[in-house]
Amino acid sequence: MNRERYLQEIDAVNAAGKYHPTWESLSTHPVPDWYREKRLGIFLHWGVFSVPAYHDWYARNMYIKGSPEYEYHCQHYGQPKDFGFKDFIPQFKMEAFDPQAWVKLFREAGADYIVPVAEHHDGFQNYRSELSHWNAAEMGPHRDIMGDLLVEAERAGMTLGASSHRVEHWWFLGHGQEFDSDIKQPMHLGDYAWPAMPERENQDLFSEPTPTDEFLTDWLLRCCEIVDRYHPRILYFDWWIQHSAVKPYLQRFAAYYFNVMESRGGCVINYKHDAFPFGIGVPDIERGQFAEAKPFLWQSDTSVMRGSWCYSVQPDKAVYKAPQEIVQDLLDVVSKNGRLLLNFGPKPDGTLADKDVEILHKLADWMRVNDECIHGTGLWRINQEGPTKIQEGQFADGASRNFTSEDFRFTCRGGNIYAACMACPTDGKLHIRSLREADASHLPLWHGIVRKVEVLGNPAQAAWTRDGEALHVDLGDYQSDMPVVVKIITD
């Protein structure tokens, strides 16, 4: 690829297009209506890191002397100077990859968009690229695995996305230069480990060494190549794009992305840490959520495993969340005007782990009954009641969330209210205090009429009463290890 010519094309599109590389211009780009209908997405952390099956930062940590990953690597594969991270690439074969089967599982689980990792911090591209030979079409699987997956997802009616974690590659392999390893100078643009810069303690807005124009131009071209090759309608950026040096390149990319996708129904950027000014794109919280409902759209991305984003066999990493907890997260996020991007880590042979499949089947079973409280719904006047409080912020999904039968999340649709009980009561009795009888006083309490109450998934007529304390619903013999949804028909 002629890089200079590609840059000229990018700038020409931005000069002639509706959107220009300024925050003022980019802030006029709306979130498309189709995105407002999304509720559940599938995130896929796949790549070379799935071969050692440790966790997704293995490529960095194996070059930190004394780290658990370094010790593990030396014990199982030898010294990094003899067997580096790049030497895992031939074992990343994806020989059993069946994208059609994957997409079928995702759709049955209620997912309506998909975001595979295009390139992670390690610098290996999971798609066909003309900017680097270190990609899945030329090495490892020798297949455009992302392209093949997106084709099947589009056929199944899923909205296509992609994620870029490339910018952290600036320093991700830098520790490999601190001792005798396979990462050494000279390194040049196009080399796998390049630039492998020193990693400072504070990787944030103004951390040094500052990314160079050469590196950030390469970042820009890689992002634009993903757009031009696959036209993803959602592009997710991981952290560190908030760095001050990245901002002009973010503007150029966002303008190009918005302009290219303008005739294709629009697009959305997911970002973290206020990398974009508020109102441009959709903010994302990693492994966490907000404590209260928000008037703006937002996203929570989390993984089915607590200790890793990628496939892992390490006992302290491959700790799976229970399906009940995942559904509770979905209900909590949707009730607060959010979307849940749920991550799975495929195996290096292209299959999904048995536990992943089990979770997807459990989600499918629950969504088959309760989808109407998720898709097509909006915010109710309150989003929650109950004693259990969510710890707000990122990396909070390890905090205890012992939901009780007194905890509810609310959505509404077509004049109906949906009250999801986060933990099915053992005595079969629900007491929804937000729907109690109330007078028309100055207090902002709900004063509507309840005509009928249904328990989704329970064919029996629900017995219910309403008084000044609560709406009381008797589930009878109905029991479930998953959240139970009550549909309240109002007038």
Protein language model features and the residues they cover:
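Mature catalytic domains of secreted/periplasmic carbohydrate-active enzymes
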Residues: 1-491
